[in-house]
Amino acid sequence: MKPRLQDAIHTRPLLGDGAMGTQLMLAGLEQGNCGEAWNLTQPERVLAIQRRYAEAGSDCIITNTFGGSCIMLNRHSQAGRAVEINRAGVEIARQAFGGRPGYVIGDIGPFGGLMEPYGDFTAAQVREAFREQAGALVDAGADAIIIETQTSLEELGIGIDAAREAGAPCVIGSMAYDVTLDGSTFRSMMGVDPERAAKFMEERGANIVALNCGTGMDMEHARQAVARYRAVCTLPVMAQPNAGQPKLVDMKVVYDETPEQMARGVEAMLAAGVSILGACCGSTPEHIRAFRSRMDEHFESQRRRSELEHENQTL
């Protein structure tokens, strides 16, 4: 029987997966269409993407349910299939491991709107949408729930509460930070800095604090965020940085950091104390494969160092 996710990361850091949205588009999803619905209509294509991540070495696969709340799915007239879509997302991610041990992290992204008094949704409506989604993910066997790409503490807190109410065995809260133009610091779109976010998530009952996406959040800035989390918080940290800085090419935003370039930051990320390392915008299975290689080299180096220290102590 495999250990719980929060127990496994105390043994050694785990490797997450990479971007899903861009991989879906490469597989044929048209811009503006509902990628989450592919869990039901094109499950073999979703499975093929996640299997490539698993084969690249991912220990954790995040479900294809980022926009899987009934509020988000309503934009595509799919709200009534929210439970079905989320359950299928877990089942597909589990299949990607091909029977080997691995962790499925159920994905809950932003609900896509604003709450009162600035928008049309009440906190109760958002909470119920997240609770329904989290419940479906947990019932299908997700090992953890991640509330990700959050910019406001209010929505993040509602998501954490909903996941806990649904009985999630592990709850991950993940903020998206934007780097300032001079690169000196970063905050969420709503002005939340890493220290405030980490303290909030720990107090709210998250099991793991995380960061993902955000403008300019490359490996180095993500490493800084990990260090800032760990300076004020006792919880494990997960990071999913982007593949470099965004660039505008032919009126499209692209991330052009190669797998080898991005993987050069793995050692520093591990030294900063990250417990789960994945990747976000612009990343591919090849990036994750490069991460796996660097992480395995790190673990082997640690093993040899430990053996040498033990031998010296016995002389």
Regions found by a protein language model. Give the residues of each.
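Domain-level signal for soluble alpha/beta catalytic cores
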Residues: 1-315
